[in-house]
Amino acid sequence: MSTPGKAVLRVRNLHKEYAAAGQTTVALNGIDLAIEPESFVSIIGPSGCGKSTLLQIMAGLASPSSGDVLFGTIRVQDPPRDVVYVFQQYTRSLFPWKTVERNVAFGLENKGTIPREEIVARTREMIGLVKLTGFERHYPWQLSGGMQQRVAIARALACRPAVLLMDEPFSAVDALTRAGLQELLRSLWHKLGLTVVFVTHDVDEGVYLSDRVVVLTRAPGTIAIDIPIEFPNPRDQIATRALPAYLDYRARLLAQLFSDEGLKTGEAA
């Protein structure tokens, strides 16, 4: 668990309610969470537990009903310049009329204060880091799903964010592409010293990628458990997943999720 003094992003007693058709639905109930610099934190939980809502509030894209989020010492009310969000639906977040190069450069150009030479250099650097050199002049619709998501990641990282928020970014690709994107993300995390908050439905993905996993209960979402994941680095898709410790973490997280759903191991659907 991170300490308040070290947190780059801090959620304090956060509640979120929605009103519809004369009824109030509580989505999040009393969330307290501190994210340390250069940590990789995954948030998992059942569908509808408020994972994406929490991430949107952390990004300044939605407002809490009560409680707050701090980026450093600044209360988040609008999207902070140094916090970047990668969406699940990459096909909707990329501009189909812009090339890979222009998509990646978009955030830098939008700042309006970065010299053109630096924009070109950083764009080229990020395209290289996500292994898309040679595809600079391609359009999103000419790329595979995994390549499109790499463009979205490159665009986010070109802005050199302090915090990268990712909402199920690999859920729409096949298993092999997902494994490749996982390796790419972990490599970039280490190389660039990123702070990552990663929402996923996939327990295995959370355990493999992270150095900490937070489990939310079914709505109204609260934190059920928050555990550190301690594996040696670098990790390996086969060897790491075969470690007894990996299987123990996985079993512990699944037990929590099953318990919240009122299920037992081996129970038929």
Residue ranges and their predicted role:
Residues 59:
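Helix-to-loop junction immediately C-terminal to a conserved catalytic motif
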Residues 67-79:
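Conserved ABC transporter NBD signature motif
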Residues 158-162:
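A short, proline-enriched helix->beta-strand linker immediately N-terminal to the Walker B motif
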Residues 101-109, 120, 124, 228:
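Short helical segment in ABC ATPase nucleotide-binding domains corresponding to the A-loop/adjacent helical element
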Residues 164-167:
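Catalytic Walker B motif of ABC-type/P-loop ATPase nucleotide-binding domains
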